C-alpha cells in the first residue's frame, strides 16, 4: 500500500528532529569517560581539596608545595592539593582530543639526576601549548586562578604548559596531572620553575591565607583552558 502525501509530510519533520537529536547527543557527549565536560577549548573534571597534605612536611622526605593535581589513586595523591576523580591518562587523552600536541620535552633524567650538579637534565624547562588552570568553587560566580590560590615566595609565578609525557606514566605511576615545576611526571607543568629549582628551594608554594577554598574533603571542579 502506498503512503499518502500527507503522511509523508508528517514523517519528514519527525525524522529531521530525530536526526538532529542524535547529532546533538554525539556532539555534547563527553569524549573521555569520567570527564565532566570536554568543550571546544576546555576540559573540566571534579576533584577534592587536600590542603594539609599539600603543605605537609615529612621529616624532610615529603614534597610540600609540589603536586597541584593528582589522580586520587595515584602514588603522589597523598601530597596533592587537589585529588582528581579522573586519571592522569584520561586528562591527557581529553587534552589531545582538542587537537593540541604536547611538548613531551622531559625525560626521566630530569628528575633522576636532580642532585647531580653536572647534569643539565634537571635544568630543562617543560614545553608545550599554554594552558590556563582555573578552579570552580561552589557558591562563587567566577573560578579562581592559581594566583588567587597559591603563594609563590620565588615570585616567578605561573606559565603552565601541556607537557604530556605519556611515555613516563608507566615508569612512575604517580597519577600526576599538574606539577608546579617542570616535572617529567606532569601532564601540565610550570615553565617558570625547574626540578633544579625544587632541589635548591628557590620557591615553596603554599595556599594563600584566606584563599576561598572549601575545607579538606570539599569538592571543586578543575578547568583546563587551552589558550
Regions found by a protein language model. Give the residues of each.
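N-terminal Sec-pathway targeting helices
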Residues: 3-16
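Long, low-hydrophobicity ectodomains and other hydrophilic envelope-associated domains
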Residues: 28-227
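Hydrophobic alpha-helical membrane-insertion segments, chiefly the h-region
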Residues: 17-26
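Intrinsically disordered, low-complexity sequence elements enriched in Ser/Thr/Gly/Pro
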Residues: 1-6, 27-29
Amino acid at each position: 500500500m502506498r503512503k499518502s502525501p500527507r503522511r509523508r509530510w508528517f514523517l519528514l519533520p519527525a525524522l529531521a528532529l530525530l536526526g538532529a537529536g542524535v547529532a546533538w547527543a554525539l556532539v555534547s557527549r563527553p569524549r573521555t569517560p569520567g570527564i565532566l565536560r570536554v568543550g571546544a577549548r576546555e576540559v573540566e573534571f571534579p576533584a577534592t581539596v587536600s590542603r594539609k597534605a599539600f603543605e605537609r612536611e615529612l621529616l624532610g622526605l615529603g614534597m610540600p608545595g609540589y603536586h597541584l593535581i593528582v589522580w586520587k589513586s595515584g602514588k603522589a595523591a597523598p601530597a596533592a592539593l587537589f585529588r582528581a576523580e579522573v586519571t592522569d591518562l584520561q586528562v591527557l587523552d581529553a587534552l589531545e582530543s582538542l587537537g593540541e600536541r604536547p611538548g613531551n620535552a622531559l625525560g626521566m633524567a630530569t628528575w633522576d639526576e636532580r642532585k647531580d650538579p653536572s647534569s643539565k637534565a634537571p635544568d630543562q624547562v617543560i614545553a608545550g601549548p599554554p594552558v590556563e588552570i582555573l578552579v570552580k568553587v561552589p557558591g562563587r560566580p567566577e573560578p579562581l586562578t592559581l594566583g588567587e590560590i597559591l603563594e609563590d615566595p620565588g615570585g616567578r609565578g605561573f606559565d603552565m604548559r601541556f607537557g604530556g609525557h605519556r611515555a613516563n606514566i608507566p615508569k612512575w605511576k604517580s597519577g600526576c596531572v599538574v606539577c608546579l615545576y617542570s616535572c617529567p611526571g606532569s601532564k601540565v607543568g610550570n615553565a617558570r620553575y625547574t626540578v633544579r629549582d625544587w632541589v635548591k628551594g628557590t620557591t615553596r608554594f603554599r595556599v594563600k591565607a584566606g584563599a576561598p577554598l572549601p575545607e579538606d574533603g570539599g569538592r571543586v571542579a578543575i578547568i583546563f583552558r587551552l589558550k
